[in-house]
C-alpha cells in the first residue's frame, strides 16, 4: 500500500492516509505530473494510455497525488474483480494492518461487516415520542 502523511496539516497532521488494493501493486507514484503527463488530462492520463510503469517517486514538494498501478490479465470471456482500499489510520502500523485485514476479505463480506458495525452503533439508542 501507498502511505502518506502531512505533518504540517493543521487538522489531520498526525493521521496516515493509505491507498491499497486487493490485487498486487506493481508500481506507485505520488507525482501528479508523472501520472498525467505533459499533454494528458485527468480523464486521459498519459501513464494509463501509454501503459507505463510508475517510477516510485514519492517526494515532498511535488504536486501530490496517490497512484498505484497493476498489470491485470483478464482471460478471454472471463472477468476480474478489483477493489481499492482508501482510508486513514493513527499510525503507519495501523494503516498496514487495516490494508492486510481488508485485502483478504470478500467485498460483500466487508459491506455486511460494515453495516453490522454501524447498526450496533446506531441502534443502541431508540427514542419514542408521543407524536
Stretches with model-predicted labels:
Residues 1-76:
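Trp/Gly-enriched beta-strand surface patches
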Residues 5, 46, 100, 109, ...:
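Residue-identity detector for glutamine
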Residues 12-13, 27-29, 82-84, 91-96:
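Short helix/loop capping segments that flank catalytic or ligand/cofactor-binding pockets
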Residues 88-111:
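Terminal amphipathic helices with adjacent charged low-complexity linkers/tails
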Amino acid at each position: 500500500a501507498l502511505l502518506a502523511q502531512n505533518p504540517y496539516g493543521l487538522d489531520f497532521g498526525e493521521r496516515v492516509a493509505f491507498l491499497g488494493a486487493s490485487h498486487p501493486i506493481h508500481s506507485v507514484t505520488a507525482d501528479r505530473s508523472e501520472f498525467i503527463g505533459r499533454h494528458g488530462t485527468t480523464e486521459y492520463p498519459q501513464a494509463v494510455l501509454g501503459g507505463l510503469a510508475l517510477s516510485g517517486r514519492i517526494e515532498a514538494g511535488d504536486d501530490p497525488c496517490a497512484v498505484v498501478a497493476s498489470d491485470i490479465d483478464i482471460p478471454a470471456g472471463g472477468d476480474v474483480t478489483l477493489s481499492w482500499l482508501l482510508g486513514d489510520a493513527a499510525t503507519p502500523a495501523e494503516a498496514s494492518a487495516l490494508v492486510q485485514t481488508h485485502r483478504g476479505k470478500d467485498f460483500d463480506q466487508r459491506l455486511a461487516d460494515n453495516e453490522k458495525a454501524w447498526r450496533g452503533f446506531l441502534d443502541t439508542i431508540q427514542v419514542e415520542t408521543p407524536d
